[in-house]
C-alpha cells in the first residue's frame, strides 16, 4: 500500500510540474532608452522597433520581472516603479506607478511573442527615457 501511495504521489507531482511548465509567462522588462548605440544582449528586437519609431539608439535592461498568464500581479522594479498586470477579456490591463504616483493606466493586447512597448518616463540621464516591454513567453 505504501508503494502504491508513493507512486500515486509521484505521478501527481509530475502532473503538477508538467502543468506549471506549460503555463505561459508574461515577461515585463524595464528598459532605459538613450541616444547612444549600446544595446543589452536579448533586447535587439526591441531596439530595432525603438530605432524605427523613436529618436533613440541605446536600449539597456534596467530590471526584469514576470508573472504567470493569465496575469494578476503587481511587480516591483528598480527606481520605485510598480507595474500591475491583470488579464481582462483577452487583453492585459497595465497600471504603472512610480513611488505610488500613477503614471499610466492602459490595456494592451499581446500577440504571440511580439513585444509591446509602453511608457516614455523620465530616465534620469539627459534625454533618457524609461519604457516597459511586455511580452508573452512560452
Residue ranges of predicted features:
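Bacterial N-terminal signal peptides that target proteins for export
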Residues: 1-8
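Bacterial N-terminal signal peptides
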Residues: 9-16
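Outer membrane pore-forming secretion/assembly proteins and partners of Gram-negative envelopes
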Residues: 21-138
Amino acid at each position: 500500500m505504501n508503494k502504491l501511495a508513493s507512486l500515486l504521489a509521484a505521478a501527481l507531482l509530475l502532473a503538477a510540474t508538467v502543468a506549471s511548465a506549460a503555463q505561459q509567462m508574461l515577461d515585463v522588462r524595464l528598459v532605459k532608452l538613450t541616444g547612444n548605440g549600446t544595446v543589452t544582449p536579448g533586447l535587439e528586437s526591441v531596439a530595432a522597433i525603438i530605432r524605427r519609431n523613436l529618436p533613440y539608439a541605446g536600449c539597456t535592461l534596467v530590471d526584469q520581472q514576470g508573472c504567470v498568464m493569465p496575469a494578476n500581479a503587481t511587480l516591483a522594479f528598480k527606481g520605485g516603479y510598480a507595474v500591475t498586470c491583470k488579464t481582462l477579456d483577452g487583453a492585459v490591463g497595465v497600471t504603472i506607478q512610480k513611488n505610488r504616483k500613477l503614471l499610466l493606466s492602459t490595456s494592451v493586447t499581446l500577440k504571440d511573442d511580439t513585444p509591446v512597448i509602453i511608457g516614455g518616463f523620465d530616465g534620469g540621464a539627459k534625454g533618457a527615457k524609461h519604457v516597459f516591454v511586455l511580452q508573452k513567453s512560452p
